[in-house]
A protein has these predicted regions:
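Histidine- and acidic-residue-rich, metal-dependent catalytic cores
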Residues: 4-8, 12-228
């Protein structure tokens, strides 16, 4: 059985009140971390492209896109002043930031039980060498959706324009991620990232845009329909 088959739930409608609450939670996070909104959508778009390269089924692509959009929702528990710090963080501040994957999982747990969504939120900072957080998973212990989001998250963070840092070029970002293949990132996910050209912003964007923005539409009513 493939990894994505292990994570595929039976499809059922989610209760409408949970859908609305999840949409509200997403908007709260985007209001708390304004830069996080563009980052979340860019990560979701790239995640879908990577997921398609693994031939994930459509419903799994929907779920991984929701997880990617919400991957940093736990930063709601991180003070805005810490998120907006222009320089390096203190050790105490860094520990607070590192808590966001587990905090995000806790925030969405009453609303979503889908394993792909939950794994993307909780485990996108795990490393294949076992030195990540929050649970220090190693290699294939990290579900494929989380390994995919980890690569997309890092790439988009490296090329993002921020007031306090100079973005990498796509080539520089890709080179840095390739250097970390096998230690921080799944080598197969990295290989597929290398194969994806920068047509992300042109060819196929209309197909992936709906995945990336679903959780913010119509009070969350545009969320994919899957078993919680």
């Amino acid at each position: 059985m493939s990894v994505h088959e292990q994570h595929r739930p039976s499809l059922e409608s989610r209760p409408r009140h949970d859908t609305i609450e999840l949409g509200a939670l997403t908007r709260r996070y985007f209001a708390h971390d304004f830069e996080g909104q563009a980052h979340a959508r860019n990560v979701a778009r790239l995640t879908v492209r990577l997921g398609k390269s693994f031939a994930l089924p459509r419903q799994d692509l929907l779920a991984i896109a929701v997880g990617a959009t919400l991957h940093d929702v736990g930063k709601l528990t991180v003070p805005a002043a810490v998120l907006e710090t222009p320089g390096g963080l203190t050790s105490e501040e860094w520990q607070v930031v590192k808590s966001h994957p587990a905090s995000g999982d806790l925030l969405v747990s009453p609303l979503v039980r889908h394993p792909i969504v939950r794994s993307a939120i909780r485990w996108h900072h795990e490393r294949v060498d076992g030195r990540g957080y929050p649970d220090r998973l190693r290699g294939s212990e990290i579900p494929l959706p989380a390994r995919i989001v980890a690569v997309a998250d890092a790439y988009e963070a490296l090329i993002a324009a921020r007031p306090y840092s100079t973005p990498c070029s796509p080539a520089e970002a890709l080179a840095e991620i390739v250097d970390c293949a096998g230690s921080q990132f799944d080598p197969e996910c990295v290989r597929r990232l290398v194969e994806i050209d920068r047509s992300i912003e042109t060819r196929g964007i209309e197909q992936t845009r709906a995945f990336a923005t679903a959780v913010t539409c119509n009070n969350g009513a545009g969320l994919p329909r899957f078993e919680r």
